[in-house]
Every structure is written in structure tokens, then in C-alpha cells.
Amino acid sequence: MFYTKLKNTYDNKNRLTERTAKEKKTGKETVHTYRYNAYGDVAVQDDTQFVYGDVSGQVTKETTKLTKNKDVVKNYTYDSKGNKSTFSVKAGEDTKLSLSYEYDGSSRLISVKDSEGNQAVSYAYDTEGSLSERQAANGLKTTYGYDYQNRLTSMTNETGKGVVSKYSSTYLKNGQKAEEVSTVMDKNGKSTKKTAAYTYDMLGRITRETKTGREDISYTYDANNNRKQMTIGNKTTAYQYNKNDELLRTDTLHTDTEKNDVVIYKNDKNGNQLATVNRSEIPAEAKDTSYIDVDVTLGDNQLNDNVVNHYNALNQLTETLTKNYKVSFTYDAEGLRTGKTVNGEKTVYVWDGDQVVMELSKGGAVQKRYISGNDLVYADKGENTEKTYYVTDMHGNVVQLLDESGNVTKTYEYDSFGNEVKPEKKDENPYRYCGEYYDKETEEVYLRARYYESSVGRFITRDTYTGESDEPLSLHLYTYCENDGVNAWDPSGHYKIKMKHINGMKWKKNWKGRKWTKKNISMMNALLKKYGIKKKKSIALMMATCDQESGQGRIMQEEGDDNYCRSHGYTVYTKGAGYIQITGNDQLDFLSYIGVKPKTNRTEQISKKYAWEAACWEWGICQKGGHSMNKYVSDHGKSISVFLITQYYINGWPYSKGDKKYEQFNSDMISLRKKTKKFSYNRKKIVV
């Protein structure tokens, strides 16, 4: 329907000041503007203003225009380690939400309390750092069990009245789930035990799922990784695509009635799904359905069971028309959805990081509040209103709703790709599959960057992240979780996160575990020289910082639903990237410095290709600014989480020998302390 032309405007310091996307055919523009403070932080982004802390550089106040005379104001405070300690939301003069947070010595969240000091949820962790117990205010207690590979193998949800649901899983050698046994109580107090089993092909795509009480489901795929066929009982659905992997048509054959349900899809030139037209009960022998046309200008009276979508120049869904609904959407400069209007009734979304914390009317009245810790705990409609508590399974799917007394009020069940087994049209709860926001009007799951249509197991728009050449399945621009919805989820709308995770962080191959070769030693030396990191203490301290910031080199990017990322105000696209976790505008500055065009997901872009160079660039800035190492630690140590490790190199390790922390870091980095002109690590040499 249209192609998009993008234009970025920069100031004399090479900072982005305006981003304009223009539809070539219609001329319509989507514009986002940016202004900066004296320290180079974004001070104004569209209609949102930011205030930062003097020491930490973290956002302490965020103000967004709601109406002409009313603002939404979010306030943050942080502890000495940079963890979010309080968070509040005001709409106009009224405080709508106020929460406080507590952490253990490793900055793991252990408690969330409301404005009156009542504990909403608490968390406990095992010796490996994995979540072992979760306790909600209504008495809901969740316990977690793991195997020797730290895979989640058991999970029990119980209240004072007994177990409401429990799960256990076994895994294949490659880590994919083989079987899950569940026992779930319904609202009538009846518990049902079911067993689900999963089969995969050699590429890791799910090919078959069976579950007690349900018809078996099987899947096949074509050479381009598109779903080719799905069979459920006596129904077989075949899928057709064009050369760009855009879905064109589905044919669902009912073998018992010989009827063929046809759905035709229309796509624009940017690969966005414009419309779907349902033509039910076409005889199976009627192979020629070319006469079925898709009119994207259909009026309300012509829609019937059809759907029409409209997009802006950034390929964001802005409007959906169905038989019963007219739905429109708005977004901020980070791509997060700020509003949804259904048949004239507008809902405003208030975010904390990448999680919705509140829904407001257009005038600022509270419609819903969502209280979260490491995960979603409960929803209510304001202070002193009834709370609805969320219960999840091992995949993070919402499987039960409980009242304040711990009684089950609603249950959910899904297939591997998020289709509800028995959906209820009057259900007002939006959080369902993977604990993500489901739009019942469009029957799609909102995953921040894109919308997911579970009925076909695909996104309705192309991915702006094009994947990795060494991971062929990631190159597909439409599939959900590389056709494996059992062992992964996709909260960003860009890439899957495997179920094996630690505190929401994505673990990758790491520099500590990777052997130093002549090639990468040469690369490292070149980067050290390029960014002027030549002093032995500078090299030692930079490598120590990389070691500490990235969990001894294991983490190249922060993502997922990790509370640490949310508490620091990092959006889905600007969380820490590289071995020194650079964030936000630092990412733009770095990419501008090396002459690389920023992608939508800068965190992924930097982590995949520039992890080491970003670290050297960040450290080089410290040196070029004339900072002594002690001053750098004083100014930034707490905010970058390297205070103790930098003290180790500058003033000596504060702990005594024999202390577990001393031994851990000393054994890993003893070579960094050597007063030589060579940097030694993993028995290899990096020479300056």
C-alpha cells in the first residue's frame, strides 16, 4: 500500500533531534522529537519530560501530558546500588499508585509494598540465584524446583486452603520440554490432572502436541520455515504464502463434513497484514477461489467476519476494523503503546520500564492498576478496591485468577502457540498467554514491537530485527519463537527468549568461556589502541569492569522481564548492551561514533556485533575526560555496579582472605593485577 521514507535530524553534537517517517504514497508523516539537557541526557521526548538524579544519572521524574490541564507524573527513587526503591504515579494532583521495593545483597528483589506498607509480594532465592519461593498478599505461595542444569522442573501454587495448581516437567537432552504433568483446580473446586507431551523435528520446531482431554495437534513446515499444515482432530488447515513469506490464504478442511473454510489475507508493500476475509463453508472441491477479493475500504456494514488494519509510516498498527469494533492505537517514541480507543472509549497506558502499571481514562480516572514485582502479582481498580491475583504455569502463562481469599475465580488453558482452549467473550482480563496483554477486540497479543496472531502462529508485520546468520530460523521475519512456543517466549516482538533463564537475563556464549585466539587477540589489541586504553591500570580496570558488569563475561545484553532492568528505567530497546552495559543515549552516541545506522533494537544490535568495541569506547570516554580512576569510581561506581571491584584494584580488596567473595574475584582476575605491560587472561596474552 505504501513504502516508507525515514529521515533523522541531528544537532551540532550529532545527537538525534527528530525522526520522521513518511509514507511515500500518501505523504502522511510520523514524527518524534528529542531535546537534551546539559549532560547529554534526553530531557524532552515528544510530550514527555525527564529529570535525572545528580549522582546516578537515573530518571527520577517523568512527566507526560494527559490533557491540556493535567499531566501524568512518575517519580522514582533509588538505593545506593542503583536499584529502584520507590515508584509513584500521579494523574493531575492525585496519587494513583505508590510502591516501595526491597532487595537482598545481590540486588535481587525480595519485597514489594504498597503505600500503606502492606506487602504485595515477596521473593526468595536459592544458592544458585534462582527463584525458589514467591509469596503474594492473599496467601498464594509458589515454590520452584530445579534440576542440576538449573532447569525448572517443578512448580506448586498453593493457598491456605491447599494446592490450586502444580506442574512438573521433563526435558530432552537438547533442553526442550518433553512432557509436562499439571494438576489445576477450577472455580468449582475440582482439580484435574493432565499430561502434555511434545515432539520436535531436527530444527527444534514443534511437530506434535498431545494433552489429556484434548485433540492431538500436529504441524508441518515448508522449506522457508513457514507453517505448511496444521491438523487438529478432523480439521486440517493448509497455509499459502508468497515469496516474501507473507501469508496469503488458509484452507481448513473438515473431513467429517467436506466443508472448506477459506481465509484470504491482503498485505501492503511493507509486508503489513492489511485485511483478512473469511469465506466459510466453501465446498472442498472448489479449488478456484480467485474470485474472492479483499476490499480494504470496507465500511462498517460490510465487514461481517472480516478484519481491516491500518498502519502509520513506522508500520505500527494504528487502527483495526471488525464487525463489532473500531479500535485505534497510539505509541510513544520508544514504540510502546500509549493508548487504545475502542468504539470511542479511550484507555491510556502508563508504563514502568516495559510493563504496564496502570490504565487510565482519557480524563485521568483509574480503570485498572497492575502491581508487579518480578512478575505480575495482582490487578485492582484503585485504592481499597477488590484485587484479582494472577497464577501462572511454568511457561509464564496466566492459568488462574484468584480473589483476595485465595479462591479460584477463572481458569485458562492454551495450546503451544497461545490459542485458548475455551475462550469466554465476556472475559475482561487482558493478561493471558505468556503473561502478556491480549486484545480481545482484535484477538491478538500485544508484544511491544509487534502484534502476535496466535491462530496462525505468526506476527502480523515484518520484524525490523533481521536475525542472525548463524541462527537460520531467526532470519524469518514473521514466525513466532522460531515455531517453538513451548520452550520460548517473545516479550519484545523481535526475538525469542529460551525458557532456560536466570533472573530474566539472556545468557550467551561469553568471552570468558571462549578461547582467546590470535584473531580475537589482534582484534582486542586494535580496539585498545584505537580508544587510547594503554595504561596497565586502565586495561586491568576496564577488563574488571567488563567482568563485573556482564556477570563474568556471560551477559552481553539485559532483556526479558528482569526486575533490575525495569527498576532502572531501561526500555525494551535501550537496556544494557555490550560487556560494559551501555544504555539509552550512550548507545546512539556510540553507533554514531563508529558510523553505523541505529536499528530499532539498539541493545541487540550492539550486543551482537559491537560488544567489545562498545566497552572500549565507553572506557575510552572516561580516559579522554581526564578522570582519574578514583574520581571515576566516585562519580560512577555505584551506578555501573563496579564499586567493589574497582576498589579492589585501586585501594585493595576490602574483604579478608578466605571470604567467599574475595576468593571468587581473586581467582578469576589475579592476572589483571600484575604490574606488567601485558594483559594476561585465560592463559593467553593481550599485548599493548
Label every PLM stretch briefly:
Residues 8, 34, 50-51, 76, ...:
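A residue-level detector for well-ordered beta-strand positions
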Residues 4, 98, 121, 285-297, ...:
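Low-complexity, glycine/serine/proline-rich disordered segments
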Residues 337, 401, 419-421, 453-460, ...:
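Short, low-complexity export/processing leader segments characterized by acidic and small residues
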Residues 420-424, 487-488, 548-562, 625, ...:
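Secretory-pathway/luminal and periplasmic proteins that interact with or process carbohydrate-rich
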